[in-house]
């Protein structure tokens, strides 16, 4: 995983992607994937990521992530 990450970071730097943009996109994708893996269950996804439920809710709203499979 470390080698893949280093290659990705190198590519991003070459393309001029800024740190804040990279961090934001990583967080958005990471949260969306965890939420999908937990079938839209916000509490389970928050637990998987080690986030508080309120933080997870705020970030899902902030990034406008759709909760597929949510009841």
Task: Show which residues each predicted segment covers.
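Bacterial C-terminal helix-turn-helix
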Residues: 2-71
